[in-house]
């Protein structure tokens, strides 16, 4: 279990769900992870549902933007990366070949953010914190534990994020298919990059939540109306599973060693 009051630039710091049915998602995740969910008015009639464990924020549930819903885009978990200057980082991302879908904007007094699509096609968010630093609890059951990019171009993706965020990438010895472990500029492990699987799958950042009972959590996903896409899988140092909530959002579960 690790409490957080700040994040080093380049670190994954928050995740939220864009969904077509907030109330159904609230019921699913509160039962699955024991989240305590608080409805927060976010302007223009929008409710941002903040999820907590033991009084510490861990994630949120938000309504899917109308344009995505009308285009038939499935619900998805978003990955936020803390930066010092979101305006400068968004400009740099564009220079490196990314698409800035939402230029930097203020989120009330919580922070300032931008929505980016990397050159290979994966979406992510840049976050400059004000009153909301991000998750107050990580690497604990029900909390964010890892972020993993599935990409059709490992080298291209690694170079983009190195140039944008100062990350380092290290090939995991003996991994087949290849796997790059990502670290922030100060040397902390921060995620991974792997080939998109199966081939042809659109690139995306997969969000992992920790669990202390993987088999039990997988069973609960199914009992609550979700789908188990990949059951208990031994990856050597941990066990993982990939699942889908009843509205269609994909996320992963992790059971293994957790850093402080």
Describe each region flagged by the PLM.
Residues 41-42, 53-54, 61-70:
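Conserved donor-binding loop and adjoining core beta-sheet/short helix segment
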Residues 55-63, 188-193:
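Short, flexible domain-boundary/linker segments around small modular repeats
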Residues 1-8, 11-20, 49-51, 66-92, 94-145, 149, ...:
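Vicinal oxygen chelate
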Residues 57, 67, 132, 187-188, ...:
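Active-site/binding-pocket entry motifs
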Residues 7-9, 13-56, 95, 101-111, ...:
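Core segments of cupin and vicinal oxygen chelate
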Residues 2, 36, 47, 65-67:
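Short secondary-structure capping/turn segments at boundaries of alpha-helices and beta-strands
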């Amino acid at each position: 279990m690790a409490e957080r009051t700040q994040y080093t630039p380049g670190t994954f710091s928050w995740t939220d769900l864009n969904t077509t049915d907030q109330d159904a998602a609230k019921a699913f995740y509160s039962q699955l992870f024991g989240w305590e969910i608080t409805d927060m008015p976010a302007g223009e009639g929008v409710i941002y549902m903040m999820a907590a464990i033991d009084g510490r924020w861990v994630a949120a549930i938000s309504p899917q933007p109308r344009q995505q819903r009308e285009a038939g885009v499935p619900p998805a978990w978003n990955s936020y990366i803390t930066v010092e200057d979101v305006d400068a980082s968004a400009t740099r991302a564009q220079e490196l070949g990314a698409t800035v879908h939402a230029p930097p904007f203020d989120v009330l007094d919580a922070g300032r953010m931008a929505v980016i699509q990397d050159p290979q096609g994966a979406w992510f968010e840049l976050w400059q914190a004000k009153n909301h630093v991000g998750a107050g609890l990580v690497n604990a059951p029900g909390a964010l534990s890892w972020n993993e990019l599935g990409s059709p171009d490992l080298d291209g993706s690694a170079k983009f994020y190195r140039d944008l965020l100062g990350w380092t990438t290290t090939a995991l010895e003996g991994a087949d298919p290849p796997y790059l472990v990502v670290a922030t500029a100060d040397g902390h492990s921060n995620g991974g990059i792997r080939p998109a699987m199966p081939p042809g799958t659109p690139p995306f950042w997969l969000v992992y939540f920790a669990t202390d009972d993987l088999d039990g959590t997988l069973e609960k996903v199914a009992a609550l109306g979700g789908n188990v896409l990949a059951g208990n899988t031994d990856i050597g140092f941990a066990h993982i599973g990939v699942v889908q909530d009843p509205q269609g959002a994909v996320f992963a579960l992790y059971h293994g060693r957790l850093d402080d």
